[in-house]
Amino acid sequence: MTRVKNSVVARARHKKILKQAAGYYGARSRTYRVAYQSVIKSGQYSYRDRRQKKRLFRRLWINRINAASRKYGMSYNHLINGLQKCNVCINRKMLADIAIFDRETFSALIDKAKINCEHT
């Protein structure tokens, strides 16, 4: 039986991993075994952090809205509750941008939420 040589395939596989590990420090960019572990782990971190990024940005928007609404004497949860009762459909990303860049509109939204909170 003839011997099957797979050196071409193995070299291609190793080159692919080492190319992905380019820029890593020390043996992580030069040695296949260590580079493979680093590439796998970096993929896990990337997968996890793509999901965490969404949570972190939502937290940032909520913090910004809370800080801006407290300048007008209203807490974040009262603002959101008042806007929902007024049927104002605006997401937290847009609300945070309005709070930073368009203070007149934000103060109008605060007034609208305050009026609605007083009725209930």
Curated annotation (Swiss-Prot):
SUPFAM superfamilies: Ribosomal protein L20. It comes from Blochmanniella pennsylvanica (strain BPEN). InterPro entries: Ribosomal_bL20, RIBOSOMAL_L20_CS, Ribosomal_protein_bL20_C. The keyword RNA-binding applies. NCBIfam families: rplT_bact (TIGR01032). Pfam families: Ribosomal_L20. Keywords: Ribonucleoprotein, Ribosomal protein, RNA-binding, rRNA-binding. Binds directly to 23S ribosomal RNA and is necessary for the in vitro assembly process of the 50S ribosomal subunit. It is not involved in the protein synthesizing functions of that subunit. It comes from the Bacteria. GO terms for cellular component: ribonucleoprotein complex; ribosome. Belongs to the bacterial ribosomal protein bL20 family. The keyword Chaperone does not apply. PANTHER family: 39S RIBOSOMAL PROTEIN L20. This is Large ribosomal subunit protein bL20. GO terms for biological process: ribosomal large subunit assembly; translation. GO terms for molecular function: rRNA binding; structural constituent of ribosome.
